[in-house]
A protein has these predicted regions:
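Sec-dependent bacterial lipoprotein signal peptides
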Residues: 1-18
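Extracytoplasmic cysteine-anchoring/structural motifs
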Residues: 20-73, 78-79, 85-254
Length: 254
């Protein structure tokens, strides 16, 4: 199942009587209330370097009006907005969310990047409306896997994955029973093996291109003995083993 972060946004629109003359009379005494309670979402902060202590579930959320102006924003939804209620004038809004402090343009372990958005209308008649954001994995997952058949056959064995995206570091995994999971930005990938047998003889490097790479793809790189006894790579595209994370919005008061 693909990585999915679901956000529920409950919007209560109600009448608000303006008692102060200084307030904008163009609203004609009507305001709306937006109630949020997210568990893992955030809006785009474009930083290609992975921040220290990056937490993909710390969410940056932005609310923009119909003119594209940011009217509300937070870099930490759980800490600042979860369970809170905010007042908004009637109108159309876009709510965007993404993992805070990172735009997915780097490779490495433990750096999934999530993003999503939705639109909502705050009505003037006081009726209640609801909206939801589904934040999906926006980068690419790669799993290195070494078959047991190769563990005791070669002196050294490694797989390296490089990205076609400029400035993105390659990722390497040496022969081990432990899988290694890394993430890349969306872009074509190249897998290369480096193999030396027990006699110290290196084998010619094997390369496999992976093209047509899309967000949420999961590639499992299996390194195992081929029919000739040499090391080989098989590439399995499988996004079904990626768990989903569901987040819900609850009511609160700002």
């Amino acid at each position: 199942m693909r990585n999915i972060l679901a956000i529920g946004l409950f919007i209560i629109a109600c009448l608000f009587v303006v008692s102060c003359k200084e307030e904008d009379t163009s609203l004609q005494g009507k305001m709306g209330y937006l109630r949020l309670d997210v568990a893992t979402v955030s809006s785009t902060n474009t930083k290609s370097a992975v921040p220290e202590n990056y937490n993909p579930k710390q969410l940056h959320v932005e609310i923009k009006d119909a003119s594209g102006n940011i009217v509300k924003r937070t870099d930490n939804f759980d800490l600042e907005w979860k369970g809170e209620e905010m007042m908004l004038p009637p109108g159309n809004y876009t709510i965007s969310a993404s993992s805070n402090g990172f735009d997915g343009n780097a490779s490495g372990e433990g750096i999934p990047y999530y993003t999503g958005s939705t639109t909502v209308t705050i009505p003037v008649d006081g009726s209640s409306v609801s909206a939801s954001i589904v934040c999906r994995l926006a980068n690419v997952k790669v799993t290195f896997r070494f078959d047991a058949s190769v563990l005791n056959v070669f002196r050294s064995l490694a797989m390296e994955v490089s990205s076609s995206v400029s400035g993105v570091d390659s990722q390497l995994a040496s022969c081990s029973v432990t899988e290694r999971v890394v993430y890349f930005p969306v872009g074509d990938l190249t897998v290369k093996t480096s193999v030396t047998n027990m006699a110290g003889t290196p084998f010619p490097a094997l390369e496999k291109p992976i093209t047509g790479v899309k967000a949420r793809d999961h590639y499992i790189l299996n390194c195992k003995l081929g029919d000739s006894g040499n090391g080989g790579i098989t590439v399995e595209a499988d996004d079904n083993i990626i768990p989903y994370i569901k987040t819900e919005i609850k009511n609160g008061q700002l």
